[in-house]
Curated annotation (Swiss-Prot):
Belongs to the GARS family. Pathway: Purine metabolism; IMP biosynthesis via de novo pathway; N(1)-(5-phospho-D-ribosyl)glycinamide from 5-phospho-alpha-D-ribose 1-diphosphate: step 2/2. ATP binds at residues 133-194. Mg(2+) binds at E283, N285. GO terms for molecular function: ATP binding; metal ion binding; phosphoribosylamine-glycine ligase activity. Residues 107-313 form the ATP-grasp domain. This is Phosphoribosylamine--glycine ligase. Its EC number is 6.3.4.13. Its cofactor is Mg(2+); Mn(2+).
Length: 426
């Protein structure tokens, strides 16, 4: 079986690692530029960027299954193109991908189908948005409606900051076209929870929960990033919280998908906020989270490819996904200066100490390139250092122990992944 995985992050490395465990897979193509093909058996790196190039490659190579990790390509309609050519692809069609591609569209969908979420208003006119600032309380959340690599959300503490943010997004175009429409949203103070799930548009099966760490600096301070680390499962995802999530968010979402006849097969990532004992939906992502995937998939006992095939066959109602009774911690090692300005091309040492196929200590490549059997930095987020242990405390300790075994110039990582929620000494 030939599998094509599209996307360049640590998420795609984790997907490839998990898929490669299925004995039916004899070839994996990585449309990435990421060097993870060097550490996964029968994996070939191919340099393809556009959906048309990827489609033509899949036709030429007779690829059996394509898995898309990149949100940009999903919103661009890559799934629709594959389906028009009778090729099997795992991911949402263009219509469903808009639940991530447009926060304004997603919020309207939530409101229409009774998904519990924060109060909001959407604006395409900056002057109307500025007038609205006089009618609300602070802090307030301002979101660029379009795709902004996980960085298009600002918490404005007062009116002055809010107006500056609107100017940045709508006039200065700091997020390009993503900021043409903005969502101004009620601020919810609480704990964020990430829940990945898989759907065939008939049922939604949640995965185990996770806790992302979005900010660049300790204690959740500094600039937004794509994510600096993850723990799974999330200690705050109790049975009561899970029941409220299913009743007030998951079930209404499924109702909306059916009512809108979206009819897709793929991942739904629920970004949740627990505030005052209630569970709210902050956002949908319509693909695996990064870095959540890197912590969640190693805890999946079930064969991921079989789970995907069940979804493609509209048979999710007849399967159960099994999970390890363990915990995972993922620490992101980034290039110094990320998420603003950073160097590329620095040699990475210490990777030879780890074999992700034979150990509960795993290294997933993100911004990594290979030259002459040596690995170099090639992006902002460079590596995902993951440890799986019987307790969260041990997983955190082991992950940081492993981080110290790896080195590259000006490497940076947060020192408190998981420790805001679990007291750990390391």
């Amino acid at each position: 079986m030939k599998v094509l995985i599209v996307g360049s992050g640590g998420r795609e490395h984790a997907i490839a690692w998990k898929i490669s465990q299925n004995s039916k897979v004899d070839k994996i193509f990585a449309a990435s530029g990421n060097a993870y093909n060097k550490v996964i058996k029968n994996c070939e790196n191919i340099n393809l960027k556009t959906s048309d190039d990827i489609l033509n490659f899949a036709i030429k190579e007779k690829v059996d299954l394509t898995i898309v990790g990149s949100e940009e390509l999903l919103v661009d309609g890559i799934v629709d193109k594959f389906q028009e050519n009778n090729l099997t692809i795992f991911g949402p069609n263009k219509e469903a991908a808009m639940l991530e591609g447009s926060k304004a569209f997603a919020k309207d969908f939530m409101q229409k189908y009774g998904v519990k979420t924060a109060k909001y208003q959407s604006f395409i006119d900056k002057e109307k948005a500025i007038k609205y600032l006089d009618k609300i309380s602070y802090p307030v959340v301002i979101k660029a409606s379009g795709l902004a690599a996980g960085k298009g959300v600002v918490i404005a503490q007062n009116r002055k900051e809010a107006e500056e943010t609107l100017n940045d997004m709508m006039t200065n175009k700091v997020f390009a076209a993503a900021g043409d429409t903005v969502v101004i949203e009620e601020f919810l103070d609480g704990v964020e929870i990430s829940v990945l799930s898989i759907t065939d548009s008939e049922v939604i099966i949640p995965f185990i929960s996770a806790k992302d760490h979005k900010k660049i600096s300790e204690k959740e301070t500094g600039l937004n990033t794509g994510g600096m680390g993850v723990i799974a499962p999330n200690p705050y995802y109790t049975k009561t919280i899970e029941e409220k999530f299913i009743q007030n968010i998951l079930n209404p979402t499924l109702k909306g998908i059916k009512a809108e006849k979206m009819n897709f097969v793929g991942i739904i990532f629920f970004g949740l906020m627990v505030a005052n004992g209630e569970v709210y939906l902050l956002e949908y992502n319509m693909r695996m989270g990064d870095p959540e995937t890197q912590a969640v998939l190693p805890l999946m006992k079930s064969d991921f490819l079989n789970v995907i095939n069940s979804a493609l066959n509209k048979d999710l109602k007849n399967i159960k996904i099994d999970w390890e009774d363990k915990s995972a911690c993922c620490v992101v090692m980034a290039a110094g200066g990320y998420p603003v300005k950073y160097e590329k091309g620095n040699f990475i040492s210490g990777l030879e100490k780890f074999d992700s196929n034979k150990s509960d200590n795993k290294i997933f490549f993100a911004g990594v390139k290979e030259e002459n059997d040596k690995f170099y930095t090639n992006g902002g987020r460079v590596l995902n250092v993951v440890s799986i242990k019987d307790s969260l405390e041990k997983a955190i300790e082991e992950a940081y122990k492993n981080v110290k075994e790896i080195s590259f110039k000006d490497n940076y990582y947060r020192k408190d992944i998981g420790t805001l929620y679990v007291p750990v000494k390391y």
